[in-house]
Amino acid sequence: GSAATERKIYVGKGIKYFSNIGVAEFLVEAAEVSVGDKLLITGPTTGAVFATLDEARVELKPVETVKKGEHFSMKLDKIRPSDKLYKLVSTEELKKFKGLE
């Protein structure tokens, strides 16, 4: 196994970036995300951007958790459509999700 203490879990992809307000929109395609989650956004131009989800908005309303199939927006430095969104989960937490190891 890997000695890393964190694993990345695919969440979804970038849809749009609103540069005038510094907000990124993502579509959740796989794992849900919740406020407080540590995130990693990657892409060919973007590189790797680490962030913590301080506030997620679905249809402009703040939510605690964003579920699969939902679009959400968050304050973020520039990202690009098609960037991939992951959440970083400690290997300890991962053990709670059976079948991922």
Language-model regions, residue ranges each:
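Beta-strand/loop-dominated core regions that host nucleotide or nucleotide-derived cofactor-binding catalytic loops
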Residues: A3-E101
